[in-house]
Design a protein with these regions (language model features):
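N-terminal, active-site-proximal structural segment of metallo-dependent hydrolase catalytic domains
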Residues: 1-65
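Structured beta-strand-rich core segments of catalytic domains in phosphoester-bond hydrolases
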Residues: 35-36, 42-121
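Glycine-rich, phosphate-binding/catalytic loops in enzymes
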Residues: 20-23, 46-49, 84-85, 129, ...
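Active-site-proximal loop/helix segment associated with metal-binding centers of metalloenzymes
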Residues: 110-129, 168-174
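Metal-dependent phosphoesterases centered on the DNase I-like endonuclease/exonuclease/phosphatase
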Residues: 50-51, 133-174
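Proline-centered loop/turn at the N-terminus of a beta-strand
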Residues: 2, 53, 110, 152-154
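Soluble or luminal CAZymes and related metallo-dependent hydrolases
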Residues: 10, 14, 96, 129-137
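Catalytic metal-binding/acid-base residues of hydrolase active sites
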Residues: 9, 36, 117, 160-162
Length: 174
């Protein structure tokens, strides 16, 4: 399986570039982050015309994740156990979940497309959210692998760890 991941920063603005890149590079599975659209707004037809099926989890103009695959996908999940939500000014377990995780079983591999929260500054509530989110992901992953020791798992995505644009391969490409 040829697997790639890409923060597309709005799939509707980059659908042609994304599909062309996938075909040109013979990508079997693409995990996308920051799709910035609802599932009904995702340009699925362009991917289907190129031979891909798509699983999408998006809520609005923020965040959002998707997986496009030439291989059959099953058991699509749009969150993981313990995944925290976030809403500025709100605390507790009732915070809404953001569209930051989607996974599918593809060719006996659990493929995750993850858009890890940006921590912003150390004193911002979003920093605590990022740490809680990563902790919940680690716990979920440990539990899944302990329960299914033969499970192959790929955790892919935008982990939001680059402190400056210079850490990007080519900032002008976006």
């Amino acid at each position: 399986m040829r697997l790639a991941t890409w923060n597309v920063n709005s799939i509707r603005a980059r659908v042609v570039r994304t599909v062309d890149w996938m075909v040109r590079n013979d990508v079997d599975v693409l995990a996308m982050q920051e799709i910035k659209c609802k599932p009904e707004q995702f340009p699925i037809a362009a991917f289907e015309e190129a031979g891909y099926e798509v699983a999408v989890h998006g809520l609005n103009q923020w965040n959002g994740v998707a997986i496009a695959s030439r291989l059959p996908m099953s058991d699509v999940q749009t969150s993981f156990s313990g995944m925290p939500g976030f809403q500025k000014g709100m605390e507790g377990p009732d915070q809404p979940l953001e569209a930051r995780a989607i996974s599918a079983l593809i060719d006996d591999v659990r493929v995750w497309s993850l858009y890890i929260p940006n921590g912003r500054s150390l004193d911002d509530p979003h920093y605590r959210y990022k740490l809680d989110w990563l902790g919940a992901l680690a716990e979920h992953t440990r539990h899944e692998l302990a329960a299914n020791p033969n499970l192959a798992m790929a955790l892919t995505g935008d982990f939001n760890v680059a402190p400056t644009d210079e850490d990007m391969g080519d900032p002008s490409f976006i």
